[in-house]
């Protein structure tokens, strides 16, 4: 299992995504974006899963990173135009 953080352009996107994660049975929570990641709205969703979860309509998502064991992040998704 891996830990992922997804950031969003607006708060509603993070709330909606947290619900999606929980509906799939993943441990997920909305939280402030870590200082070394940026987000337009300041909230993100941190969740644990075997694979990243991409909603069919994920245009609300700004970025997604995987959390590495050493505390660093590896970006696995970035919205077009950023």
PLM feature spans:
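Amphipathic, hydrophobic secondary-structure cores in small proteins
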Residues: 5, 11, 15, 20-22, ...
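C-terminal structural segments of small proteins and small subunits
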Residues: 51-82
């Amino acid at each position: 299992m891996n830990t992922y953080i997804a950031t969003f352009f607006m708060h509603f996107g993070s709330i909606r995504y947290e619900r999606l994660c929980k509906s799939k049975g993943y441990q997920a929570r909305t939280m402030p974006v870590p200082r070394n990641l940026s987000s337009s709205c300041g909230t993100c969703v941190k969740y644990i899963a075997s694979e990243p979860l991409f909603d069919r309509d994920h245009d609300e998502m700004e970025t997604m990173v995987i959390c590495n064991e050493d505390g660093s992040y590896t970006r696995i998704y970035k919205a077009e135009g950023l």
